[in-house]
Amino acid sequence: MSNSPLLAALSRRVLVIDGAMGTSLQSCPDCHLDDWLGRENCSEILTKSRPDMIQRIHESFLEAGSDCVETNTFGANLLVGAEFDDEVVAMTRELNREGVELAKAACEKFATPSRPRFVLGSMGPGTKLVSLGQTDWDLMFQSYAEQARGLLDGGTDAFLIETCQDLLQVRCAVNACLKALDERGMGPEQVPIMVSITIEATGTMLLGSDIASAVNALRMLPIASLGLNCATGPVEMTTHVDFLCRHWDRFVSVIPNAGLPVLVDGQASYPLQPKPFAKAMRRFVEEYGVNIIGGCCGTTPEHIAALVELAGDRPPPERTPEPLPAGCSSLYGFTEFQQDNSFLIVAERTNANGSRKFKRLLDAEDWDALVSMGREELRGGSHLLDVCVDFVGRDGAVDMDQIASRYATSLNAPIMIDSTEAATIEAGLKRLGGKCVVNSINLEDGEKRLNEICPLLKAHGAACVALTIDEDPQAGMAKTAERKLEIAARIHDLFTGKWGLNEQDLLFDPLTFTIATGMEDDRRLGHETLEGIRLISERFPECGIILGLSNISFGLRPVTRAVLNSVFLHHARERGLTGAIVHASKILPRTKIDEEKWLAAEWLIFDRRGEDRPEGMDADFDPLLYFIGLFPEGEDAVEKVSLESLPLHERLQRHIIDGEDDGLPETLDEALAEMSPLDIINKHLLEGMKVVGVLFGDGRMQLPFVLQSAEVMKKAVARLEPLMEKVEGDTGRGSIVLATVSGDVHDIGKNLVDIILTNNGYTVHNIGIKQSLQQIVDALKTTNASSIGMSGLLVKSVTVMEQNLKSLNDLGITVPVILGGAALTRFHAEKRL
C-alpha cells in the first residue's frame, strides 16, 4: 500500500505540473552570462550561482496554481556532468539535493493543508543513448543512481524520468531509482517513480519505438505514471494519449510543448498561446481520463494558469483501461503471444547448440553475418528469435552483449534470450530495449534457478519460458501429462506468488520428446505432451504454452520429420499451444500433405497399436514402421500437383494457393491471350488469395506459406500492371492517401487498390505499412488529398481503424474514408464504424 502524499492527491483530483524551466530562464532579464560560471548550457549550475532566480521561477508557477514543480536537475547526472568538467561531476549529488531544497522552499510558501504542493525530481535522458552503444547499461545506471541519491537527500516527493527517447534508458533509470530507494530501506510506495516518454512528430520515439511497444515494455516496471512530454504540441499527441489512456492501468500524464516550434529571428518560438493550449488539453482530461497535465517547452506561468482553471478541483477521471494482450516487443514493435489464426513462430537457428552455421559464425566473431542470419529467419516468417550463445570455450556474457546490441537496432523482432547462465541472460537484458522473453526457468535444482532468474525478470520487465522439470531424481523431466501439470502448477505459484510476476508473462514448455526410437517407453510421449498442453491450458488460460517442436521427430529423415512436425503442431494448437521454437521450413500446411501420410502421422502420435489399431490393419501393426515406409528414399514429403495438367483458371489460382512461381510467367501469358489483366487479377488471382485467407483463418495454412502466396501475388501483379489500360494526365477524379494501419504489415490488397485507382485516373499517395494516424494525417495535409484509404489484414487492425475514425472526427478531418481488409465485414463497417 502506498503512503505517498502525491499519490494520495492524485487519487482525489487532477494535478497540474509547472511549465518550462528553460523558457523561463531565457526570459529572465537578470540572467547574465557570468551566472553560468563558464559552463554555458549547464542550467543546473544556476542552482549554485543563482538560487534566487531558480526559486523565483518555481514560485512563478506555484503562484499560477501549479500543484507540482520540477527541480532544476534535468541534466544533473554523472554522464552529462562529464561533458563539462570534473568539478560538475563531483557536484552531481549536491546539485540534485540543492535543486530539491530550492523547490521545496518555494512549495512551502504556497502549500496549505487542503492544497499541498509537491516536488518532482527531474531526471532527463542525458546526451548518450544506451541502445545506440553510446554508453553502456552499467555506466548509465551509476549515473542515474547518483542523481537519485541526491534527489532523495533533498527530500523529493517523486522521481520524474522525463523526455525519454530510448526504452532501455527508461528501464535503466527506473532500476537506478529503485537501487537508491533500497539503500534507504524505502520503495516506490514512499517515493513514486514517474515516467514520461517523448513521441516525435514521426509518431514514434527517437529510436523508432511506437506507443504500444513502450506500454508493453514498461508495464511490468513499478512506475506510478506513464505519460508524454516534449517534441510536439497537444494536438499532435492526441492519438498517442488516446492509446495510453485505453491501455495503461495507472496514472497518465500529458506535458506538451506550446505547439510545434517555428523559427523567429533564428530562434525557436512556440506559438500556441495559453487559452488555445488549455483548450487543446481539455479533451485529454474530460474524455480520455488524463490525471496529470502540465507544460514543456515554450509554456509560461500563463499557460499553467490556464491549465489550473481547466483542472479546477476535478476528481480523478474514470477510466477502464484494457491491458494490452500478453506479448513481447522489440524497440520497434509489439508482438502478441497469441497470434491471429496462427501460432507464435520462434526461430530456432540463431542458436549455437542447434545450428552449425550460427556456431561457426559466432566462433569467427562475424557479427555482421550473424545479423544477416537473424534477418533471414525473420524473412522466413518468424515472429521472435531464440538466441543462444552457450558453448564451451567462449564467454557467453560477452558474446550475448555483442549480439544483443546489434540485434536490438538491426532487427525489428523481439528476442528470446536462451541460456543456462544468469550472467549471459543479464547481459542480453542490458542491451535489449524492448520486452524480451527469457528461456528458461525450471525446478531441476529446486527453487535455485527461479531465485537467480526471477529478480532479472522483475528488473527488466521480461517474460519467461518455464520447463516442466523438477528435482525428482527418477522423473525430473515430466513425461506424463499429470506430471507436466503438477510441475507447471508449482512453478506458477512461485512465479506469481513468491515473486509477484504476472502470469501472462509465463510460457510453459511441457517438453517434447522423440517418438521415433521404437522403444516402448517412448511410444506415447507425443500423446502425453498433447494431453499435458490441454491440461495446462485449461488450468492456466492466461499463460502461454510453447514447445521445441522438432524434438518430436528427432531421429527421422528430414523429409519424414517435416510431416510429423506439421501434424503434431496441428494437434498441439488444437489443445492450446501458443507458439513453437521451430524453423519455418520444417512446417508444411495441411493442404500440401498427402492424406495417407497425415493419417499415418496421427497413428504414430497417438500410438494406434493393438486393439486401438486402425481398421483393416494386422494385429502386429506398428505405426512407426508404417509411417517411415510411406517415404521411400528420395521421395518428397509434399504432395505434388502438376500445374500444367490443370485448366487455366484453376492453374492461376493454384499458383497463388501453393505459393508457386515456377511457370507463372507462362501461365500469365496464356491467360492474357484470353482475358484482360484486370480480369486475371479480379476473377482468378484474387480468388486464390481468398482461398489462402480461408486456410489461414481456419489454421490450415501457417504464416510463412501465406507470405509465399503473397510474394507470388506481387510477382503476378508486377507482370500484369504495365499491360493495364491507364488513364493519363490529371482527370480531376480526386486523390487518396492509402495506408496499412499501425501494427499491420500486410499490403497486397492495398497495393492492388493503388494499381487499379492509378490506372483509372486517380492520384494515389501510397505511404506504406504500419502507418500511425499521425503519419496518415501528415500525408493528407502534405498532399492535400481528397480522401483516405486505410487497410489491414489482422483482426486487431479493425480496432485500430475504429480508433482512427474517432480521432479523425476529434481532429475535425471530414474527408471521405475508405476501409478495407480481410477482417473487415460490411456488417461491422455499417454498424460499428
What do these predicted ranges mean?
Residues 1-833:
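Domain-level signal for soluble alpha/beta catalytic cores
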